[in-house]
Amino acid sequence: MFANVGFRTLRVSRGPLYGSCSQIISFSKRTFYSSAKSGYQSNNSHGDAYSSGSQSGPFTYKTAVAFQPKDRDDLIYQKLKDSIRSPTGEDNYFVTSNNVHDIFAGVADGVGGWAEHGYDSSAISRELCKKMDEISTALAENSSKETLLTPKKIIGAAYAKIRDEKVVKVGGTTAIVAHFPSNGKLEVANLGDSWCGVFRDSKLVFQTKFQTVGFNAPYQLSIIPEEMLKEAERRGSKYILNTPRDADEYSFQLKKKDIIILATDGVTDNIATDDIELFLKDNAARTNDELQLLSQKFVDNVVSLSKDPNYPSVFAQEISKLTGKNYSGGKEDDITVVVVRVD
């Protein structure tokens, strides 16, 4: 923690961040276009970091979900009734469990910048999670299709379905999906800046990496009409148009009592992994018998910090580095977590 004296307050939920740095236009919504092609390069594959655990027999998993949407009193949201009704805001999630030994889970975060242009930013993340839930359920019920049960393929199949069905007119979303199989070999596919972390004895032992084209501009799966693409081209801009093939893939061997967290950037923009470690250590007793209460308390704590104008959030510190000015304050955003415990 650093001293708050001399720090400008960060109020990202209300509009532009005012400062002397002219290249910083607005931090209130994430970007869905870029003036240049991404400079991010990824090998799209990450191997095991740990050898197989000693646990015998099939792994068992317990899950909990907690979320809190940000306040939607801005006029732009009043015009988007579906967005207001979404209980998770622009975030969405799914958890598919045919039995306690085989689980799929994921979160998706609709890119909020579209709301400023009159589009429901929650639509694409909601439809994507709905399709990922349907696909993972159908595949899990058919053991002969076990080879198809990869998170990356689930993202790809779901994205193809929502494009074909044309329910979503405009939007962009991140996506992270994890498979928790009976052998404990965690598989994760991530596209964008949502996050997965594995904690062992309250210490981080594995995490995914963010994919971005720039500050506050994540990789995203987008649906954009042709006329909007042409208009962007006339302006000399480019929308961020990723495909499921761009998702990074990870694998990691779990052990009994591991805690796994899938989270949208409402968490990681506010707190660091050190903070999560401290929270899990302070609430170790609840990880055994009160996973839902633990998850909700975690979200409540992050929400409180996101509304604190004096809190030195991760987001505020990044802005300080970019601008050379000292900013403080949490970043108000939708916050969603899926928490999994290995039993």
UniProtKB/Swiss-Prot annotation:
Cofactor: Mg(2+); Mn(2+)
Residues reported to bind Mn(2+) 2: 109, 265
PROSITE patterns from the UniProt entry: PPM_2
Record text on cofactor binding: Binds 2 magnesium or manganese ions per subunit.
Molecular function terms from GO: metal ion binding; phosphoprotein phosphatase activity; protein serine/threonine phosphatase activity
Transit peptide, from-to: 1-39
Binding-site residues for Mn(2+) 1, renumbered to this chain: 109-110
Subcellular compartments: Mitochondrion
Induction: By the presence of non-fermentable carbon sources and oxidative stress.
Function text: Protein phosphatase which positively regulates biosynthesis of the ubiquinone, coenzyme Q. Dephosphorylates and activates the ubiquinone biosynthesis protein CAT5/COQ7. Also dephosphorylates CIT1 on 'Ser-462', which leads to its activation.
Protein name: Protein phosphatase 2C homolog 7, mitochondrial
Biological source species: Saccharomyces cerevisiae (strain ATCC 204508 / S288c)
Gene symbol of the encoding locus: PTC7
